[in-house]
């Protein structure tokens, strides 16, 4: 993903993250509810208590192949701060991570934080799909991570993914459904397909 595309996504996500932090009623946050273009935003003075957001995911958060300041968490923090939000987005992305790998390191990552995050962006599953891992296994790993976050009373914004048609109808339907099913089960906020604007 190019830095310009990430900038577009980060401005869109800033709206979604604010909704998640503020605990709005609707648990599903469609990307189309945000600005459709990465138009320049006038800086607003940063105010209020710091909101710590943990971006936990794979290479899409780690920024594989990008300069550090071009990564998604960094762009998101910049977009939030330009909007006057005193946000700190902590990059906890690891390139190549599957949901199983994320499950193994989540508790350690949370324990390593100075203070409890105000929100976790949970973005995994793409590498499961690329490796043909069965959606039931991916779902079980997500459920374990959501259990961990629920026990720690940390709100979650689930960053949904979708499988392409060439994976077959059955796989596609099972994979795509797991995010919305988990969001309903755990009361998590959901972006149904957070990369949607990239593929429009």
Could you say what each language-model-derived stretch is?
Residues 31-95, 105-116:
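Serine-esterase "nucleophile elbow" of acetyl-processing enzymes
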Residues 28:
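Cys/His-rich zinc-coordinating "finger/knuckle" motifs
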Residues 21-25:
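Bacterial signal peptide processing site
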Residues 85, 104-200:
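Alpha-helical cap/lid subdomain in secreted, periplasmic
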Residues 60-67, 91-96, 127-133, 164-169:
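Second-shell loop/turn segments in exported
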